[in-house]
A protein has these predicted regions:
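Rossmann-like dinucleotide/flavin-binding elements
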Residues: 1-51, 89-163
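Conserved N-terminal glycine-rich FAD pyrophosphate-binding loop of Rossmann-like flavoproteins
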Residues: 47-61
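Helical element adjacent to the flavin cofactor pocket in flavoenzyme catalytic cores
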Residues: 60-69
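Residues that recognize and position ribonucleotide moieties
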Residues: 70, 78, 95-97
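General small-molecule cofactor/ligand-binding pocket signal
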Residues: 70-72, 130
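A conserved short coil-to-beta-strand element within the FAD-binding core of flavoproteins
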Residues: 73-84
């Protein structure tokens, strides 16, 4: 995923292709489009930013219209190449979307390969294992933010935030 991307980008006429029209994908486009990149955003859903709140949707539409962002909806990622994403268009056509910078901002599957071992290793100790984010299940940024807040509450309750 793209969450927390940090890139120094001064400006270019290069191609930026983003796969995933959720919050993070929209943030990537919002960063690069005003800096001169030719942006394309791809999503499997019938609308870019479909799950976004109304204010985000309005801002997105304004940015995409102002900077000529190309949108591919009902379009599925098939392959990631060094300088292109291969996608399947709604009519079944396979197409390469070439990029100078490509971002995979898809919702992913939960990834917690060592969670059981960690829980076993720290069983009967005062260490609490608290799975968060996509280690629990693939989900939205808001839920990850709520997890972060819950962790702060646990740390505060145990006195670890008293600085």
């Amino acid at each position: 995923g793209c969450a927390g991307f940090t890139i120094l980008f001064v400006g270019t006429t290069g191609e930026v292709v983003v796969v995933g029209g959720g919050s993070v994908g929209l943030d990537v486009v919002e960063y690069f489009a005003p800096r001169g990149a030719e942006c394309t955003i791809v999503d499997m859903l019938p609308q870019i930013g479909m799950l976004a709140d109304p204010i985000t949707k309005c801002s997105m539409r304004e940015t995409h219209d102002k900077y000529g962002v190309k949108e591919y909806v009902n379009t599925a990622l098939q392959e990631v190449k060094e300088n292109a994403f291969t996608v399947k268009l709604p009519d079944g056509t396979i197409e390469d979307l070439n990029f100078d910078l490509g971002f995979n901002c898809l919702g992913m599957r939960a990834n917690n390969p060592i969670l059981v071992q960690l829980e076993e290793a720290f069983d009967n100790t005062d260490t609490f294992i608290y799975p968060i984010g996509d280690s629990v299940r693939a989900r939205r940024i808001m839920e990850g933010t709520m997890d972060g807040r819950a962790i702060l509450n646990v740390l505060d309750a145990r006195g670890f935030l008293d600085l």
